[in-house]
């Protein structure tokens, strides 16, 4: 069969790629600085390829994907010309899967990697008589940062996370920095966003900080302001949307160990945007998380915090509508 070159041109949505022998590990941090992303690559979540997809064009009727075996089930989505045609569930120990019966027409192929498990890629093959080429995207790039609610462990499949749905609806190329339990607004992540040229940025603020009792009334706004200031060092005019937490059941009015509630955090997140705009930053905007999922959607939060698969689909549609006024495609920003 005919191998596809796996590199930064065909593996999209990763921040960097780590070569391990004959394997490639997509990372959602800069590999060269990996020791600085403490603890242990954001507790391992930077190694999980949420939003990462192998992307190319081909006329092949068959494809084979090879990877390192896992101790767990691993899901992949196969998307042809922006339509999901199959979710492949790979069993523990398996090292490949094949998709056949495709048309001989020229098509865009996207193979979404798992948003739940680490994936080490080995090869992708098309038919030996088929042609393939790098997909030259004209889409704008969008980077989103958040928690497990952005990583979307409970999504129906890898291409059904809310960021993937939003990106598809708005015709954007996605970079997803959703790190389960790790959205603490540390400077290394701010530097990562600063040093990744994109057209649009969205930041979700609050729920991991509430759950981790990380910052109090004195430090909550200060850490997020500093985070955005770092991004602005190299991306001064790129639109940034800062969103506050979605509905969080008892967390709404129950203070955490440092005295914050989600109600108070939303007020402070909104105020952060007002501070930036008052000081001349007209490219930063606020989205209230309750406009995405509110108390009326509590049935979509089975554990009172994380959305289920239907909840993530709704979030994808709602965020697309919320971001659309700010992510204007005719805007061109220099990095």
Residue spans for each PLM region:
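N-terminal secretory targeting modules
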Residues: 1-141, 324-335
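Serine-esterase "nucleophile elbow" of acetyl-processing enzymes
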Residues: 102, 111-197
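Oxyanion-hole/transition-state-stabilizing segment in secreted/luminal serine hydrolases
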Residues: 166, 185-225, 230, 245-252
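Alpha-helix N-cap and loop-to-helix initiation/capping positions
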Residues: 215-223, 257-265, 303, 307
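Substrate-gating cap/lid alpha-helix
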Residues: 250-287, 314, 333
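Histidine-centered active-site loop/cap adjacent to the catalytic His
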Residues: 302-335
């Amino acid at each position: 069969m005919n191998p596809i070159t796996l590199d930064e041109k065909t593996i999209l949505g990763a921040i960097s790629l780590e070569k391990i022998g004959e394997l490639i590990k997509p990372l959602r941090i800069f590999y060269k600085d990996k020791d600085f992303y403490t603890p242990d690559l954001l507790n391992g979540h930077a190694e999980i390829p949420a939003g990462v997809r192998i992307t190319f064009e081909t006329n092949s009727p068959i494809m084979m994907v090879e990877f390192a075996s896992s101790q767990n089930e691993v899901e992949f989505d196969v998307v042809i010309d922006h339509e999901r045609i199959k979710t492949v569930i790979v069993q523990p120990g398996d090292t490949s899967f094949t998709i056949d019966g495709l048309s001989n027409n020229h098509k865009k192929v996207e193979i979404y990697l798992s948003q739940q498990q680490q994936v080490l890629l080995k090869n992708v093959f098309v038919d030996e008589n088929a042609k393939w080429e790098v997909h030259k995207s004209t889409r704008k790039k969008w980077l989103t940062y958040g928690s497990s609610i952005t990583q979307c462990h409970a999504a129906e499949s890898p291409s059904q996370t809310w960021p993937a749905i939003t990106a598809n609806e708005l015709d954007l190329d996605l970079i997803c920095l959703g790190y389960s339990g790790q959205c603490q607004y540390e400077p290394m992540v701010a530097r990562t966003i600063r040093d990744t040229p994109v057209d649009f940025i969205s930041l979700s603020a609050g729920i991991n900080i509430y759950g981790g009792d990380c910052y109090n009334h004195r430090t909550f706004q200060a850490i997020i302001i500093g985070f955005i200031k770092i991004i602005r060092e190299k991306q001064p005019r790129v639109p940034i949307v800062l969103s506050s937490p979605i509905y969080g059941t008892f967390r709404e009015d129950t203070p955490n160990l440092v005295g914050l509630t989600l109600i108070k955090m939303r007020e402070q997140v909104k105020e952060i945007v007002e501070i930036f705009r008052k000081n001349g930053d007209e490219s930063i905007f606020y989205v209230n998380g309750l406009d995405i999922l509110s108390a009326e959607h509590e049935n979509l939060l089975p554990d009172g915090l994380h959305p289920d698969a239907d909840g993530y689909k709704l979030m994808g549609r709602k965020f697309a509508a919320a971001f659309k006024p700010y992510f204007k495609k005719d805007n061109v920003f220099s990095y």
